Structure formats: C-alpha cells, structure tokens
Amino acid sequence: MRESLHIQGGQCGNQIGAKFWEVVCAEHGIDPTGRYGGDSELQLERINVYYNEASCGRFVRRAVLMDLEPGTMDSVRSGPYGQIFRPDNFVFGQSGAGNNWAKGHYTEGAELIDSVLDVVRKEAENCDCLQGFQVCHSLGGGTGSGMGTLLISKIREEYPDRMMLTFSVFPSPKVSDTVVEPYNATLSVHQLVENADESMVLDNEALYDICFRTLKLTTPSFGDLNHLISATMSGVTCCLRFPGQLNSDLRKLAVNLIPFPRLHFFMVGFAPLASRGSQQYRALSVPELTQQMWDSKNMMCAADPRHGRYLTASAMFRGKMSTKEVDEQMINVQNKNSSYFVEWIPHNVKSTVCDIPPTGLRMASTFIGNSTSIQEMFRRVSEQFTAMFRRKAFLHWYTGEGMDEMEFTEAESNMNDLVSEYQQYQDATADEDEYEEEEEEEEFAQHDM
C-alpha cells in the first residue's frame, strides 16, 4: 500500500487538518468512533493509505499533531472526530510561539522537535511502503511556519527519497492577523523552496472571496474556509485511495507539474463549489466542471492566473465520466486559451480520472496549476518584508532568540530570486535563438563566480 503520513502543525494547520479528516472519514465510511459503517467494498480497499487498522477492528488515522500550546489540540480532541487520533500522536508544548518564527524554528520548537520526530518515525515504521508526507500549516504565525519548516527539513534529512507535500496558508494581501507575517512567511518560503517537493498555496483572502462571491455566504467562518481547503486536499489524494481509470500519485504529480525544481508552488481550485449546508441540486457535466475549474475566481490563492502563464497544470476528475470527454475538454481549454500556456512545454496539462466522487456529489474536479502568476504573491510579501526590514522593525524579537540578521537577508534574496525565475520563464518563448541562450549561460557563469 502506498501510505501517506499526515502532519498538522500550529493553530491553522490543526484546524484545517481536523476538517480534512472529517471529509476523509465521510468518504471512507468511518464513524466518529473509528468503526466502519460504509456501504461499498471500495471504501475499504485502500483504506490503509490514511488509516491503521487496530486490533479491535477500529481504524486509527495516520496523523501527527503538533503545536506549541495545548489550546487548539484540546479542541481537536474534543471535536466530533477527535477519538480516532492516536492519543500518543498529540505532541504539544505549553509556552506557545507567539507568532515568532524564531521561537518555532530555533528555541521552543527545537526543544519539542525530537518528540515529534519520534512519533513520525513510529508512524513511518508502521507503513508497508510510505509514499510521502503531507504537512498542513500556515506561514504567517510562529508554530506552523517556524516549527513546521524545521520538521520538514528534519524529515527531509531522514527520508530523502519520500515525497514532501505541503498545504501552506500564505498571509493575505488585505487581511493581516499579525504584524510580523511578512517576516515569518519569507523565512518559511526560504525553507520550503529548498526542502519541500510540492507546495499547495492557499490564502485566506481568496477563500473569503470564494465564500462571498460564489457560495453567497454573508459571514464566512474559518470553518467554511477550511471546508473548501479540505475538499481540495481530498481531491489531491483521491487517486491513492480509490480505483480510477487514469491514476496519479504524489510522485507522478510532481513529475508532471515541476519543470524546474525550485518552481514547485501550485495554485489549487475545486469544482463544483457548493456551500457547506447546501448540496447542489443540478447535475453537473464535464464541460461545466472544466469551465468552473479553470475560472480564475476559483483559485484558492490571491494571484490571478490571467496575469501570468501556466507552465503546467493537472486536472483531477472524480465520478463516473467518459475519459474521452475529459480529454476533449482539456484540449479545448488549451486551444481556446493558448496564450495562457507556455508554448515551450507541449501537452502541459495532465488529467486523471478517479471513479469515486466525493460524498454527496455526482462528479467533482480538483485543479492544480503551476502558474508564473504566483509570483504576485511572493512579490507582495517580499515588498512588505523589505519595508519593515529596511527599518529593522520588530527585529529584536528574532535576534533575541539567537537569529542573525544575515538569515533575513538570505531569505529576502532567495524570495526575490524565486520571483525573477518565475518572471524569466513567463517571458521565455519557444523559438529564442540558441545564441541568446549561450549568452545567458555565460552571464550565469559570471554571476556564480
């Protein structure tokens, strides 16, 4: 079995994670006590991807929960599905990281990290063939960003050949929870560029917009936002868990989506968008799904794909549908919007079809795109970072935990390099002369010296 080990860190990560597990439990017919009450053999066929079967016939999740304060975990534990986590897999401190990346990465988090790694090791040893790790965290706070990236780099050392997928919630453009978000996010991206294989970029503001505009919710709660995220998360892994006509896994996804190793930050979308209470009453068709899925208003991060070009994209359909129709729709999208795809990667949209739809829907689709427009997001965070860093504002909180200013400078330049790499490939064309390329190579050689 190709198991996937789920790790959630910090308040945001734990809340998203809890929602995600509700969705997965519903899909596999697992009730809040961990017993199977479903109606289809297929639900049990590959249940091992996310669950361990305990001796008494109960299913226990392959999940590790960590935080530097007990609050969020207590609410997860007392939540509707809190009973199916292994009690030993809750690892928490008492002091909190206080939105300080350095506390999460160097001081408080570093003290707790070994206990987290012990749990991760124990879970990994329980797997027949571990495919990889998925980490939920936010980049604006202290624990999810600081300790989350610390854990990712430690896991990277210990399991270098396993896939590392992150669901990372970026700071929003207009809505800010904490002043030091730009610092925390930039320091985290600096780590993610090096240590993650695939990062799904999420953003509260874009999720709010979807709730207002598409779902017509007047006062969306974090619960509604997390519901959207969990639908996408479940879509990304559905091929591991259910049989399909065209399968994919985390590794195939990476091979098809990442043309250059540093450019592994993806935009995600989901269709059909329905609010939590209302199941949609109209039957959906593949063309409708495709249209909604590629719609820029559907993207869960605050970047507009129309401002850049897609390097690659992947569409994951779920439900009973004809693969021929899926292929036709995909070709159709690429032909109609050819200017939004780079022409130097032919056939750059991968599609997968999984037979089992999500609970309560006849068909659904998840979209993952590697678009150069995501640089808007990095650029925005980078500008805010520079504005504060020039004045050395709030820096004493970080240096007081033993950080060096040099690390900030490195993180800043790494983020700026990332932005310019995206820009470079956005502007690249297929028929540039080899002569130009040689010139560029020479420039790079001089640059590196």
UniProtKB/Swiss-Prot annotation:
GO CC annotations on file: cytoplasm; microtubule
Keyword flag Cytoplasm: yes
GO molecular function: GTP binding; GTPase activity; metal ion binding; structural constituent of cytoskeleton
Keyword Magnesium: yes
Alphabetical keyword list: Cytoplasm, Cytoskeleton, GTP-binding, Magnesium, Metal-binding, Microtubule, Nucleotide-binding
Assembly and oligomerization: Dimer of alpha and beta chains. A typical microtubule is a hollow water-filled tube with an outer diameter of 25 nm and an inner diameter of 15 nM. Alpha-beta heterodimers associate head-to-tail to form protofilaments running lengthwise along the microtubule wall with the beta-tubulin subunit facing the microtubule plus end conferring a structural polarity. Microtubules usually have 13 protofilaments but different protofilament numbers can be found in some organisms and specialized cells.
Family per record: Belongs to the tubulin family.
Function: Tubulin is the major constituent of microtubules, a cylinder consisting of laterally associated linear protofilaments composed of alpha- and beta-tubulin heterodimers. Microtubules grow by the addition of GTP-tubulin dimers to the microtubule end, where a stabilizing cap forms. Below the cap, tubulin dimers are in GDP-bound state, owing to GTPase activity of alpha-tubulin.
Protein name: Tubulin beta-2 chain
Name of encoding gene: TUBB2
